[in-house]
Amino acid sequence: QRRYSHMKKITYVLIFALLVPYLFVTQPTVASAKTTHRGAYSNLVDAKSRKEVKKALLDAGLSEKNVNAWLSDVKDYNKTIKNTGLVKKGFKKLSTKNPQYDENKIMELWNKKYPDFIGYNCRITAFDLMKDKISVKADAKVNASNLFMDQDALKHAPAKKFTKKQKHVFETLYSTLNTAYTTDVDTHIKKQQKAWKQNEVKISGTKASLITVVFHSSFGENENELFIGHAGVLVPTKDKKLLFVEKLSF
């Protein structure tokens, strides 16, 4: 285990997007005190919402094979947890409070079926949708120290998710990197961008964007890291809106 329980950790959050020139899907939200317009979300329980999201992903250029595999995971997850606390049909308008789920019940139901498999997290889910659109340098430097839960999930998954080459791309994309002991956001942005550039991380052939939330973990002056703590896939829709696909639970 890491030393999280023994040392004070300061974490800052940056948001990056790798842009092109489960189970929670959101439609646009305007975060402003001056508007009452808010987005909507779905847990993709019903066939109609899954069909709508599938079309948006395919229209963005994502592989039908990848999208179908992801939807299979969505249906398995929802079935396993018996749709506990999920939106049963379509999209539900977001309120000022975050959606609440019975996490203990969900965990109990999941562990009953999968005692060793913790499930696919946000990083695995996002990458699985876009894996054939992402490329990296063959000899890229990798630090997978913060991917231990991902590795455990892939090891105990009911089916093999990635090839050896895809796993290398996955670990390169989500690699942990050293950074400076500072709260200056620009410094960390440059560090992350430089690492992706050195490892030739590229996305092509799709209108989809990979959105990543980058955390700055600090244990003091001599131990500072950047790691990707959350990821999702953002795609445009034909009605000029945005659809964000993210996994919020193992």
Mark where each language-model region is.
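Short, Lys/Arg-enriched N-terminal segments with co-localized hydrophobic residues
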Residues: 1-6
